[in-house]
């Protein structure tokens, strides 16, 4: 009797200030939809998506959309520890959301292992005329925080899939690395 090795369910957490477009980013990736007007997320929402990788493997991800308001941070912090990856989103048209990135990175580092794959995403690049944060500023912030940087538009869908493709590959490799270390510890 053969047993098929199943990939685990990878949990990816979306973090960032309120109104940066986390829910739109979430819906664009999960359902390929965009709503111009929507209510702010209260607490958390999650959905599971099966993703086919370039090499033909399929994996399941559970994407968690979190509330960005300060009053919900205690609730969302409980989910940090079980995350395999974190996408930290800011709005390129709102400088304050960019300036808060360091606070988010500090929270992430306090709550999760340094082994959790984290990426920084500048959203709303479709609104070029109102842009307040340059791509170079986003790249500099990511470099300072030691994480990768991407830009996207949840509205148009631009660059959403490449962000997830890169993140999922890094998460799988990271998961294998961490598990190999655990295996070595338990067997030494």
What is each residue range found by the language model?
Residues 183-188:
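Polybasic, Ser/Thr-rich amphipathic helices
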Residues 1-182:
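TRAFAC-class small GTPase G-domain
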């Amino acid at each position: 009797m053969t047993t098929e090795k199943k990939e685990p369910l990878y949990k990816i957490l979306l973090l960032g200030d309120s109104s940066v477009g986390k829910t739109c980013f979430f819906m664009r990736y999960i359902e390929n939809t965009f709503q111009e007007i929507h209510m702010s997320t209260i607490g958390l929402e999650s959905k599971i998506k099966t993703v086919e990788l370039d090499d033909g493997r399929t994996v399941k991800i559970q994407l968690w959309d979190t509330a960005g308001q300060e009053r919900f941070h205690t609730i969302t912090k409980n989910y940090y520890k079980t995350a395999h990856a974190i996408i930290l989103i800011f709005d390129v048209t709102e400088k304050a959301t960019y300036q808060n990135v360091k606070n988010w990175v500090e929270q992430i580092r306090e709550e999760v292992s340094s082994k959790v794959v984290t990426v920084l995403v500048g959203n709303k690049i479709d609104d070029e005329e109102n842009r307040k944060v340059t791509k170079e500023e986003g790249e500099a912030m990511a470099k300072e925080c030691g994480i990768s940087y991407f830009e996207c538009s949840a509205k148009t869908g631009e660059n959403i899939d490449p962000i997830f493709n890169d993140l999922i590959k890094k998460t799988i490799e990271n998961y294998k690395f961490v598990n190999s270390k655990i295996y070595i510890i338990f067997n030494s």
